[in-house]
């Protein structure tokens, strides 16, 4: 039901409960009513709304739950405000209260969608608050892999979901550009620049084997200039002995490549934060010094340890090794201090499940600083692995990366790119990229983050209802076609439909579709509160299913004006909600397919 109706019904039920409690216990008796919880029954025949408050209160009030439910229903239906909202009420099982909404209450969603348009489903309840989402945060040592793709989809969609509730959302990418892996990138590029390739004598053991390294070396030797979206241009010097110059060029080259991958995926960031800046600005040392002064550390075996067990970790952790280098979670603590200092009191990190062990360490470090950061800061969404299948076989390598499937591979394959074009993005037309982007974004968000996901390229290419993104997009396109035909055959424009007589919508299929439309705002709120962006994909599939059921049951383009326009109005509202939901996912809503 619509949020306004839900709030009204919750208030009416709460008042009814209060009346019954006073009648049973006396007006002066101490009584704390539980929060009213409304749910949609799993079986449509049981009504539109179910409430279990009678079973919660039966024992405290010393009465039978079914009798209590009957008294609550009597008090509810006696209230004038309920009579235009509730059509019928019945008691089920041990004391469930099942309510049927009035036809007018169900139909109200159509007017709400027409009135609010693209804003339908959104809320300003969190207006004035801000949240930082950090996601992808890949090392600039190679192309983005499918795990980064899942992070990008989760992060970007979750950002849209949270923004729908009024938050100002800041998207941030943390570049791990300081560490051993960057050194390995430099020596890999240097080896390629010297004419070596994997398997040759002299090829570094820790080197990266992907063909992209050869591309970097070639451009470095040719004196090409590269630049990331937020950085200064770097020119290749061609000097194979200057490892620092090679490192700078290779990092910038790969940052540019990752920018291109993200652009193809429809993901934009507000800020890129460099790990190296934490060292150059002295933030890592400052954080370590503060933890030492706070008594949160001790020295043992030549290493500096953090008392993470004080904050619930299973053992204390090394911060600074005996060789003077820091372990990887130390700059993470310093980085999160910057988030707090920048005013982000709500922070969400989206990372692979292999980062689970760092959560307690980072939080312990932040608590040990005693600077007002609350426990549980930051929040985390951890995702599991993605397996790619093509032609019934698991795909483990690609020409582009050498040892893993890249995001760009996935987009191009899912868009139908011909074999052999994977390493030549300039050969891929925009329509292929759009199809691929839509499929990959929808697929990667269509499961809970904490479940492993099998990405089936063959399924992504299917143009039938087995393919979830096609199924949802086709529903939108089908409605567009019907509304175009409405205009050409009957000269009725969508702008005229808000005046339709909605009392014509009497079928069970119409009622079910209207109820599903009305659930959209609450679904978005739930997805934001629970950090569950997959809920949007689940909802859209269900909505498309309700549309198809309605459309298959009732002819829309009939000569009788009243039922025709009412049904067309329902379709127009459905089209708008499909478009709104697809926009949250960053997926296109085609008018033709």
From Swiss-Prot:
Keyword Zinc-finger recorded: no
CDD domains: ArgRS_core
Family annotation (Pfam families): Arg_tRNA_synt_N, DALR_1, tRNA-synt_1d
Class of enzymatic activity (EC top level): ligase
Main location: cytoplasm
Classification via SUPFAM superfamilies: Anticodon-binding domain of a subclass of class I aminoacyl-tRNA synthetases, Arginyl-tRNA synthetase (ArgRS), N-terminal 'additional' domain, Nucleotidylyl transferase
Protein location: Cytoplasm
Cellular-component GO terms for this entry: cytoplasm
InterPro entries assigned to the protein according to its UniProt record, in alphabetical order: aa-tRNA-synth_I_CS, Arg-tRNA-ligase, Arg-tRNA-synth_N, Arg-tRNA-synth_N_sf, ArgRS_core, DALR_anticod-bd, Rossmann-like_a/b/a_fold, tRNAsynth_Ia_anticodon-bd
Source superkingdom: Bacteria
Reaction(s) this enzyme catalyzes, per UniProt: tRNA(Arg) + L-arginine + ATP = L-arginyl-tRNA(Arg) + AMP + diphosphate
GO biological process, one term: arginyl-tRNA aminoacylation
Positions of short motif 'HIGH' region: 138-148
GO molecular function: arginine-tRNA ligase activity; ATP binding
E.C. number: 6.1.1.19
Keywords: Aminoacyl-tRNA synthetase, ATP-binding, Cytoplasm, Ligase, Nucleotide-binding, Protein biosynthesis
NCBIfam families documented for this protein: argS (TIGR00456)
Self-association and partners: Monomer.
Family: Belongs to the class-I aminoacyl-tRNA synthetase family.
Protein name: Arginine--tRNA ligase
Provenance organism: Burkholderia cenocepacia (strain HI2424)
Gene that this sequence comes from: argS
């Amino acid at each position: 039901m619509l949020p306004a109706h839900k709030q009204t019904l919750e208030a009416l039920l709460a008042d009814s409960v209060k009346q019954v409690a006073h009648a049973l216990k006396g007006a002066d008796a101490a009584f704390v009513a539980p929060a009213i919880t409304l749910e949609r029954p799993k079986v449509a025949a049981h009504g539109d709304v179910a409430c279990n408050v009678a079973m919660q209160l039966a024992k405290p009030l010393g009465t039978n739950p079914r009798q209590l439910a009957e008294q609550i229903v009597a008090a509810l239906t006696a209230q004038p405000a309920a009579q235009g909202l509730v059509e019928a009420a019945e008691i089920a099982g041990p004391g469930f209260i099942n309510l049927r909404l009035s036809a007018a209450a169900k139909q109200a969603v159509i007017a709400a969608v027409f009135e609010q348009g693209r804003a339908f489903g959104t809320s300003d309840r969190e207006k004035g608050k801000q949240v930082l989402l950090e996601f992808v945060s890949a090392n600039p040592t190679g192309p983005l892999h499918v795990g980064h793709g899942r992070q990008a989809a989760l992060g970007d969609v979750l950002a849209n979901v949270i923004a729908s509730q009024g938050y100002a959302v800041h998207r941030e990418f943390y570049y791990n550009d300081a560490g051993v892996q960057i050194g390995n990138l430099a020596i890999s590029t240097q080896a390629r620049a010297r004419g070596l390739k994997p398997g040759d004598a002299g090829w570094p053991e820790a080197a990266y084997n992907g063909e992209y390294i050869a591309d970097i070396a070639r451009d470095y030797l040719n004196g090409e200039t590269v630049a990331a979206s937020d950085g200064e241009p770097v020119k290749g010097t061609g000097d194979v002995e200057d490892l620092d110059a090679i490192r700078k060029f290779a990092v910038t080259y790969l940052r540019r490549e990752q920018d291109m991958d993200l652009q193809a995926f429809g993901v934009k960031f507000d800020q890129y934060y460099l790990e190296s800046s934490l060292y150059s600005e002295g933030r890592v040392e400052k954080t370590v010094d503060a933890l030492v002064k706070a008594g949160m550390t001790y020295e043992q075996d030549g290493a500096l340890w953090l008392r993470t067990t004080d904050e619930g970790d299973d053992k204390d952790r090394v911060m600074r090794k005996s060789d003077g280098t820091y372990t990887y979670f130390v700059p993470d603590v310093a980085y999160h201090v910057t988030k707090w200092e920048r005013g982000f009191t709500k922070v969400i990190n989206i990372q692979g499940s292999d980062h689970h062990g760092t959560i307690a360490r980072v939080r312990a470090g932040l608590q040990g600083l005693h600077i007002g950061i609350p426990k549980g800061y930051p929040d985390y969404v951890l995702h599991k692995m993605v397996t790619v299948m093509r032609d019934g076989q698991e795909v483990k390598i690609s020409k582009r990366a050498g040892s893993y499937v890249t995001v760009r591979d996935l987009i191009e394959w899912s868009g139908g790119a011909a074999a052999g074009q994977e390493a030549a993005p300039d050969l891929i037309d925009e329509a292929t990229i759009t199809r691929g982007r839509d499929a990959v974004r929808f697929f990667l968000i269509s499961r809970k983050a904490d479940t492993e996901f099998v990405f089936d390229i063959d399924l992504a290419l299917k143009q039938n209802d087995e393919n979830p993104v096609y199924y949802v997009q086709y529903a939108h396109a089908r409605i567009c076609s019907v509304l175009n035909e409405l205009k050409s055959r009957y000269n009725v424009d969508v702008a005229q439909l808000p005046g339709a007589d909605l009392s014509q919508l009497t079928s069970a299929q119409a009622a079910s579709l209207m109820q599903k439309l009305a659930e959209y705002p609450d679904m978005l709120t739930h997805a934001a509160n629970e950090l569950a962006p997959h809920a949007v994909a689940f909802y859209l599939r269900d909505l498309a299913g309700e549309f198809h059921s309605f459309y298959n049951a009732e002819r829309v383009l009939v000569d009788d004006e009243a039922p025709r326009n009412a049904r067309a109005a329902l379709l127009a509202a459905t089209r708008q909600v499909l478009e709104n939901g697809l926009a949250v996912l960053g997926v296109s809503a085609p008018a033709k397919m």
